[in-house]
Amino acid sequence: SFIVTANEGAVTQWRSFGGMRLVRQQGWEILADSKFAETAERMGNEAVELLTADNCPSDTRDLILAPDQMILQIHESIGHPLELDRILGDERNYAGTSFVTQDMIGNYKYGSDLLNITFDPSRPEEAASYAFDDDGLEAKKEFIIRNGNLERVLGGGISQFRAGIEGTANSRADSWRRPAMDRMANLNLEAGDTKFE
């Protein structure tokens, strides 16, 4: 990964590339696939653009997010709130709870009809991939949001049993001596047929 910094007087802007977006279960080929070298010039230009850009307007507008910001948005606004142990209150003293409640599953409009989010830990190239979660459930692709509607939450076998609802195979522990927790893995915004422009 790398960071590019642009500075003029008391104003500094920076852009970065790599980090978590380059975490894969791959080797050297990830650098070629990511066009790592070619990206350096683009990041430099973006840092200068940020440095010289006008301040963002403060009125209400429609917003289209580019992929690099969309990754974070999905992680924070969809992933964590849909972890069933948070919904059940298990995380309230550590990482907080969720605005999502059990009665919202199947009844909540999470976004526009264009929003389709899948959970897919079966993708072999991704860092958060596995065949079975730590509750022994088989990992497979599942829609959690389809056409903007919340269909299911991210809850492993134990949380599913406690809540009496269907979830996903996402119960994972970071060690044999720690309890498994419901954690997102490989959330994907499914491609539609709308052009970015």
Region roles according to the model:
Residues D62-N93, F161-A173, M181-D182:
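Short N-terminal signal/transit or membrane-insertion segments
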Residues F2-R86, R152:
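Internal alpha/beta scaffold segment
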Residues R92-E197:
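Dual-mode signal for accessory low-complexity, basic/Gly-rich regions
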